[in-house]
Swiss-Prot record:
Residues 52-82, 92-121 form the 4Fe-4S ferredoxin-type domain. It is found in: Cell inner membrane. NDH-1 shuttles electrons from NADH, via FMN and iron-sulfur (Fe-S) centers, to quinones in the respiratory chain. The immediate electron acceptor for the enzyme in this species is believed to be ubiquinone. Couples the redox reaction to proton translocation (for every two electrons transferred, four hydrogen ions are translocated across the cytoplasmic membrane), and thus conserves the redox energy in a proton gradient. It catalyses: a quinone + NADH + 5 H(+)(in) = a quinol + NAD(+) + 4 H(+)(out). The gene is nuoI. This is NADH-quinone oxidoreductase subunit I. GO terms for biological process: aerobic respiration.
Amino acid sequence: MTVGQLIKSFTLWEFVKAHWLTLKYFFKPKATINYPFEKNPLSPRFRGEHALRRYPNGEERCIACKLCEAVCPAQAITIEAEPREDGSRRTTRYDIDMTKCIFCGFCQEACPVDAIVEGPNFEYATETREELLYDKAKLLSNGDKWERAIAANLEADAPYR
């Protein structure tokens, strides 16, 4: 043991350094928040709960191209479609198994009409696994509920896409 180490051990140098660090941060603003009542701002690129969007006239955006189903690495998306009278296709079944989803965002990137998006909601805890099997009605209701925030996030992210 060197003389310097011996002096530091007798003077409790580590103890002084620890208390100095505590005092330094004691007078700074807090870094934590009171979570349920205060929330940090989310990035426009945040990937949360899935939603199906509609056009302003109320028609579903999804054209049943099934690109999102094909690109999903977790195989969490299931789509069934049928043609309409005007020759276009629309989905009859659009299911997402949220227990399989890895929130990679590939479905959102692959969609040519921005129909499937990952919205800003991250608080969707459930009591059963069955509640995490989202059908078309649940996805459309998510889209209706979060449309304003989703549109703002897509607009903010548009220069980078």
